Amino acid sequence: MKRVRVKVIFVSFGLLVVFLSLSGTAADCPSSWSSYEGHCYKPFNEGKNWADAENFCTQQHTGGHLVSFHSTEEADFVVKLAFQTFGHSIFWIGLSNVWNKCSWQWSNGAMLKYEDWAEESYCVYFKSTNNKWRSRACRMLARFVCEFQA
C-alpha cells in the first residue's frame, strides 16, 4: 500500500512538472497571437497608413507596437507568420523617419543649417518576396504586424 502511494505521488509530481513547463511556452500570448523568444506577434490583413497601424498596435496590448526585428531568425519567424495570414505582400514594421531626424550633411562637408523639407515622412515596410526593407511615404496603406513583449 505504501509503494502504491509513493508511485502515485511520484507520477503526480512528474505530471505537474510537465504541465507547468508546457504552460509557460505559448500561454504567455493571448489567443490568436504567436510566441517567439518572449514576444507575441500578430499579423493584420487590413491596410492602414504607418501612424494608424502603430496606433492600432498600441491599442491591442500594453507595450504593443509595430514589429521590430533584432535578428534574422526573428525576421524569418515573422515572415512565415505573415505569409500564413496574407501571403507574399508588403507590411509595415516599426521603423520610420517620422520626425525627419536623419543626420544629413552636404557633400562638401558643411553642416546642414538651412532646411526646406517637404512634409512627407518616410516609414519602412518589409517586402516578403525578397525579405528586404524599403521605405515609402508613411501615408500609404499597407498590412502590418504588431508585437509586444510577453
Curated annotation (Swiss-Prot):
Entry's transmembrane regions: none
Record keyword Electron transport present: no
Record-annotated disulphide pairs: 29-40, 57-146, 123-138
InterPro entries xrefs: C-type_lectin-like, C-type_lectin-like/link_sf, C-type_lectin/snaclec_domain, C-type_lectin_CS, CTDL_fold
Gene Ontology cellular component annotations, sorted alphabetically: extracellular region
First and last residue of the signal peptide: 1-27
This protein's record includes keyword Ligase: no
Subcellular location, principal: secreted
Keywords (A to Z) from UniProt: Disulfide bond, Hemostasis impairing toxin, Metal-binding, Secreted, Signal, Toxin
PROSITE patterns: C_TYPE_LECTIN_1 (PS00615), C_TYPE_LECTIN_2 (PS50041)
Tissue-wise expression: Expressed by the venom gland.
GO MF entry, a single one: metal ion binding
Domain C-type lectin positions: 36-147
Cellular localization per UniProt: Secreted
Pfam families: Lectin_C (PF00059)
Similarity field: Belongs to the snaclec family.
Function: Interferes with one step of hemostasis (modulation of platelet aggregation, or coagulation cascade, for example).
Subunit structure: Heteromultimer; disulfide-linked.
UniProt name for this protein: C-type lectin 16
Organism: Crotalus adamanteus
